[in-house]
Amino acid sequence: MYALRHLRLQSARHFRSSYAAAATTKHMLPRQPARVLIGDWSTWDKSRLQDVCSRSSSTATEPVKQQTPLQELVSAAKPYAQLMRIDRPIGTYLLFWPCAWSIALSADAGCWPDLTMLGLFGTGALIMRGAGCTINDLWDKDIDAKVERTRLRPLASGQISQFDAIVFLSAQLSLGLLVLVQLNWQSILLGASSLGLVITYPLMKRVTYWPQLVLGMAFNWGALLGWCATQGSVNLAACLPLYLSGVCWTIVYDTIYAHQDKLDDLQIGVKSTALRFGENTKVWLSGFTAAMLTGLSAAGWACDQTVPYYAAVGVVGAHLVQQIYSLNIDNPSDCAKKFISNHQVGLILFLGIVLGTLLKSDESKKQRQSSLTTSTASSYVPALPQKPEVLS
């Protein structure tokens, strides 16, 4: 009996050990590969766990965000805004100031300039400056692609096709015409006559070292147009020296601007006054500044301007002298900074014209006209009537 009982206990122990071995083989072995690959979780640090979580989340598919119609419109319009340089308004300011000078000079003594005309010319400057940039980029598409500063422009980089740019230019010119027809017929004809300069300017850098001269002739057309728009005709005694002063001013600031690209211009064969003047740039710019100040003084004398005007001319001269004296023609960032500061030149002169006109009275004009009349009358001596002979 004892032997039989012992045999049963041995059999039960053997069965339990066999079952445990089988269970271990069945349930524990599949976990081994994962344990081998991952390791003991208790030994992992926090950064390692975060790395695994980030990898697993990155594999999950995220839904693509859909743009709203307004966002799509903004994305589509962005290259065109860059084409017309909306993000760089300095060109619009430099185009507007000669117009504003002329409008302010044409105002009657003691009166403010015509605000409606200033608004129209400001709108026209924004539109036509953009049109000029579009024309420039159409001509210079291949050149811009080779210049570091301009290679990302919409046409040069292929964001806009040439056909799309031409369609956009047509819209710009149509808007410019819409502004122009708000003026009198003399101004419409005078304004339309400047379009030839706007179109041909980009070509000048291929044939002459003086493209800045042509740019000055186009950019300062408003010095003639502003007076014509308010008075119905152009007073050449005042407008011509003002126009020539603006041309000299443009040569100054655009030569500074051109020094940014002179190395690229040399490689691709583009001409500019920056290359023409070279190391003598400051001497040339000083000469054009002197000519500008002389023209402004002549325009002020023709308009019977007062002390604030001539004070503003003096401040403008000091500003330009400081620009030229401190200019580093081999530092593109300094050239860009000096170029942008010319917006202050235009504003200072405009404020001087406005203040000078407000302080101007009719007395000086009447005295001058009376002196001219007196001198003319004194130079004319009528012949005394002769007594007729009496025949006997």
Curated annotation (Swiss-Prot):
Coiled coil: none
Pathways involved: Cofactor biosynthesis; ubiquinone biosynthesis
A Gene Ontology BP annotation from the UniProt entry: defense response to Gram-negative bacterium
Subcellular locations according to the entry: Mitochondrion inner membrane
Domain of life, source organism: Eukaryota
Residue ranges of the region described as Disordered: 365-392
Main location: mitochondrion
Record-level GO cellular component terms: mitochondrial inner membrane
Keywords of the record: Isoprene biosynthesis, Membrane, Mitochondrion, Mitochondrion inner membrane, Transferase, Transit peptide, Transmembrane, Transmembrane helix, Ubiquinone biosynthesis
PROSITE patterns linked: UBIA
E.C. designation(s): 2.5.1.39
Pfam short name (any one): UbiA
Functional note: Catalyzes the prenylation of para-hydroxybenzoate (PHB) with an all-trans polyprenyl group. Mediates the second step in the final reaction sequence of coenzyme Q (CoQ) biosynthesis, which is the condensation of the polyisoprenoid side chain with PHB, generating the first membrane-bound Q intermediate.
HAMAP family given in the database record: UbiA
Protein family (similarity comment): Belongs to the UbiA prenyltransferase family.
Record protein name field: 4-hydroxybenzoate polyprenyltransferase, mitochondrial
Source lineage: Eukaryota, Metazoa, Ecdysozoa, Arthropoda, Hexapoda
